From Swiss-Prot:
Gene: adk
Any GO BP: AMP salvage
Annotated organism of origin: Cupriavidus taiwanensis (strain DSM 17343 / BCRC 17206 / CCUG 44338 / CIP 107171 / LMG 19424 / R1)
Annotated residues for binding of AMP: 31, 36, 57-59, 85-88, 92, 156, 167
MF terms (GO), sorted A to Z: adenylate kinase activity; ATP binding
GO terms under cellular component: cytoplasm
Protein's name according to its UniProt entry: Adenylate kinase
Note on domains (UniProt): Consists of three domains, a large central CORE domain and two small peripheral domains, NMPbind and LID, which undergo movements during catalysis. The LID domain closes over the site of phosphoryl transfer upon ATP binding. Assembling and dissambling the active center during each catalytic cycle provides an effective means to prevent ATP hydrolysis.
Domain of life: Bacteria
Annotated stretches, region: NMP: 30-59
Region (LID): 122-159
Cellular localisation: Cytoplasm
Main function: Catalyzes the reversible transfer of the terminal phosphate group between ATP and AMP. Plays an important role in cellular energy homeostasis and in adenine nucleotide metabolism.
Keywords associated with the record: ATP-binding, Cytoplasm, Kinase, Nucleotide biosynthesis, Nucleotide-binding, Transferase
InterPro entries per record: Adenyl_kin_sub (IPR006259), Adenylat/UMP-CMP_kin (IPR000850), Adenylat_kinase_CS (IPR033690), Adenylate_kinase_lid-dom (IPR007862), P-loop_NTPase (IPR027417)
Length: 221
């Protein structure tokens, strides 16, 4: 099972990625983790990437694709792999296709933006313990304070409505076009591609976690 998970920030990709990886016995591949590991190990690509990052630059797609190809040669990828948060752009998707990286499924978790804003902006956190609440779905017994300690809850900057809206804007401009790219490739094929087109599946990411997980596994049959 080789797949790419797509969806907006806050759509619940991380939760579903964990369930998919457990069910199919495959690793979750994160470009951030790969970069850190390559830099730490001092591989040729890691050294190159470190130079760019130390200079405050963005690591090129060529380096990222090189890291991906190296990562997929490792033993734990023999049964498949799951990409979460990659590719982010059409050029990265094209580079993956040109590099012959095979994908069986592209799964989009679709959640309306207003639901994501409500889901994320309603979160409140007790910093010391990491306990998380939600104003609507899991409120504290007393407004604004942690159930166990009575200490104040905070809203993380990442969860503030204006920040969530900005992240969704970036997603719409950069990553949302991947949905059209992969659905078109799945529907029409590409004779020039080195790999077969993936199957494209879209599921609704609204409801409780068990319902969404059931939809995910049904889509991957």
């Amino acid at each position: 099972m080789r797949l790419i998970l797509l969806g907006a920030p806050g759509a619940g990709k991380g939760t579903q990625a964990k369930f998919i990886c457990e069910k199919f016995g495959i690793p979750q591949i994160s470009t951030g983790d790969m970069l850190r590991a390559a830099v730490k190990a001092g591989t040729p690509l890691g050294v190159e990437a470190k130079k760019v990052m130390d200079a405050g630059g963005l690591v090129s797609d060529d380096i990222i694709i090189g890291l991906v190809k190296d990562r997929l040669k490792q033993d734990d990828c023999k049964s498949g792999y799951l990409f979460d948060g990659f590719p982010r752009t059409i050029p990265q998707a094209e580079a993956m296709k040109d590099a012959g990286v095979a994908i069986d499924y592209v799964l989009e978790i679709d959640v309306p933006f207003d639901a994501i804003i409500e889901r994320m902006s309603g979160r409140r956190v007790h910093v010391a313990s990491g306990r998380t609440y939600h104003l609507k779905y899991n409120p504290p017994k007393t407004e604004g304070v942690d159930d166990e300690t009575g200490e104040p809850l905070i809203q993380r900057d990442d969860d503030k409505e204006e920040t969530v809206k900005k992240r969704l804007d970036v997603y719409s401009q950069q990553t949302r076009p991947l949905v059209d790219y992969y659905s078109a490739w799945a529907a029409n094929g590409d004779p020039a591609a080195k790999v077969a087109p993936p199957k494209y599946r879209k599921i609704l990411g609204v409801g409780n976690v068990d319902e969404i997980t059931a939809r995910v596994f049904e889509a991957l049959k």
